[in-house]
Amino acid sequence: MSSISIWTERWFLSTNAKDIGVLYLIFALFSGLLGTAFSVLIRMELSGPGVQYIADNQLYNAIITAHAILMIFFMVMPALIGGFGNFLLPLLVGGPDMAFPRLNNISFWLLPPSLLLLVFSACIEGGAGTGWTIYPPLSGVQSHSGPSVDLAIFALHLSGVSSLLGSINFITTIVNMRTPGIRLHKLALFGWAVVITAVLLLLSLPVLAGAITMLLTDRNFNTSFFETAGGGDPILFQHLFWFFGHPEVYILIIPGFGIISTTISAYSNKSVFGYIGMVYAMMSIGILGFIVWSHHMYTVGLDVDTRAYFTAATLIIAVPTGIKIFSWLATCYGGSIRLTPSMLFALGFVFMFTIGGLSGVVLANASLDIAFHDTYYVVAHFHYVLSMGAVFAMFSGWYHWVPKILGLNYNMVLSKAQFWLLFIGVNLTFFPQHFLGLQGMPRRISDYPDAFSGWNLISSFGSIVSVVASWLFLYIVYIQLVQGEYAGRYPWSIPQFYTDSLRALLNRSYPSLEWSISSPPKPHSFVSLPLQSSSFFLSFFRLSSYGEQKEISGRQN
């Protein structure tokens, strides 16, 4: 068998969860770079009043649509759920692979054609200038007569099918493939985050599929679901879309919660504070996420009682979110904190997610949101939660687990520099947008009065700093692959804290199962079923011995 056919079979016909996870991460990196390029175009256009680079407002809106859909469906979800989820979940539960390995492969390979459809949609005719929300009548056939919106709908359908298949796989794996000793209440928090996310996807995506299919038939088959002339109602689309759209933002952030819990615990050198509380907080956030969707729609003419209910329900979400924030702070408190790149990103996440949550409390109030709706205040709010929440969680997870994924260490100094560059860049970009929103600058408009030019210039400068940080990240990955030194099984262990006691040594060494196997893991991770004892968190399996642990920790020193 030739090396080319072996390579093709490994990467194109793979049924190995670890290889598929790596494919997801590569795909997310590519999509993220594409989405970042679109975001820089937006910020360059807004760097000054009047026309800068993009004379056509339709093109500007098409860029905004492409940026949003790329970042949400093709960057954050494939990285956090597809990438880290696939690679780590079988290791965390002690299983050999995912429950349905071939289903896993098809759920990845649906994404590249979906991405192509989205890119075609942006390039054909004037592009889909609807925003990611694709509201009718703007997305209707009168306003967008070409095939752009249809292609965007097909792209969403394909990525939705991919996510649904992945969700079924994750739920089945967690329920059926846990090794003896890992009860649900001993599962790593990242495992809980993935299964909660999978349930949310399973419940919300069919609603989106129904809404965009109805829009497709309105556009092409003369139905009138959202056409007032035929007895339809465009507000129905908003209800259907946001019934999916609000759980979607929790789908994006809950895996991040799991990663941050893992990394803060690892680099504070103590267990997560309030494990059970953390699990139930994530569950509560997931459930409450389904009953608050109309807070996106305060300005469409909802009844005053309806607005009062959605304000109250939205504010209640702050309670489980606050539990998580304070539990992370309590985990840090009294711990032996090491400011590794992963820990820096985790602390950055906590800081900026808190700021995003505070502006969310403001927007939850119907009376205030009447003023803030569709201004840059909203843009600042959700970018603090996503651009600095989900993305910082991705980097935290990457720097924590990449020695396990690649088996190579990375440059600590450069990766800390990347954190500070990105931290400064995103704050410079999005903090001024709060002020622009308070002054009433509307979203999705490519021109603005001269009075807004100062804060916009600072915001655009911040986006350039963020892009430099992204280039630095690519360079860090490059030198890791070319010059990286071998990483042991658990490169984050602290040898000076070891005692002569075997139990203490092993307790220190492996906070969860994935660190008990080689770096990078073999295609079939566990030769025999690992056993998790109730007294300490460790897997015993063939080839594992005390001598090997001492040899590995000695090699790290």
Curated annotation (Swiss-Prot):
There is a cross-link at H246-Y250 (1'-histidyl-3'-tyrosine (His-Tyr)). The amino end of the mature protein may be Ser-3. InterPro entries: Cyt_c_oxase-like_su1_dom (IPR023616), Cyt_c_oxase-like_su1_sf (IPR036927), Cyt_C_Oxase_1 (IPR000883), Cyt_c_Oxase_su1_BS (IPR023615), Cyt_c_oxase_su1_dom (IPR033944). It is found in: Mitochondrion inner membrane. Its EC number is 7.1.1.9. Binds 2 heme A groups non-covalently per subunit. The chain crosses the membrane at residues 21-45, 60-93, 103-123, 148-176, 189-220, 234-268, 275-300, 304-332, 341-363, 376-405, 412-436, 455-479. It comes from the Eukaryota. It is an enzyme of class 7 (translocase). Component of the cytochrome c oxidase, the last enzyme in the mitochondrial electron transport chain which drives oxidative phosphorylation. The respiratory chain contains 3 multisubunit complexes succinate dehydrogenase (complex II, CII), ubiquinol-cytochrome c oxidoreductase (cytochrome b-c1 complex, complex III, CIII) and cytochrome c oxidase (complex IV, CIV), that cooperate to transfer electrons derived from NADH and succinate to molecular oxygen, creating an electrochemical gradient over the inner membrane that drives transmembrane transport and the ATP synthase. This is Cytochrome c oxidase subunit 1.
